[in-house]
Amino acid sequence: MKQNIHPDYHFIKVQLTDGTVFETRSTWGKEGDTMKLDIDPRVHPAWTGGRSQLVDAGGQVARFNKRFGALLKKK
């Protein structure tokens, strides 16, 4: 393996939406940083079978519906 071409691989903390924190190794951030997730497998509709509501961070869904809502209406 070539030397000095790979990113630094270090420990970070990952905080889930319910506040649970676990430690893993990653190339993201710096040693000891905390990655806060907006959505995770416990609340994402793809993994929960659509049982939970998707959080609209920043009003992106509302902005999309405002721009393209007319195209989605059934005729």
UniProtKB/Swiss-Prot annotation:
Q: Which GO terms describe its cellular component?
A: ribonucleoprotein complex; ribosome
Question: What does the UniProt function comment say about this protein?
Answer: Binds the 23S rRNA.
Transmembrane segments annotated in the record for this chain: none
Q: Which domain of life is it from?
A: Bacteria
The protein here is known as Large ribosomal subunit protein bL31
One GO molecular function term of this record is: rRNA binding
NCBIfam families according to UniProt? L31, PRK00528.1
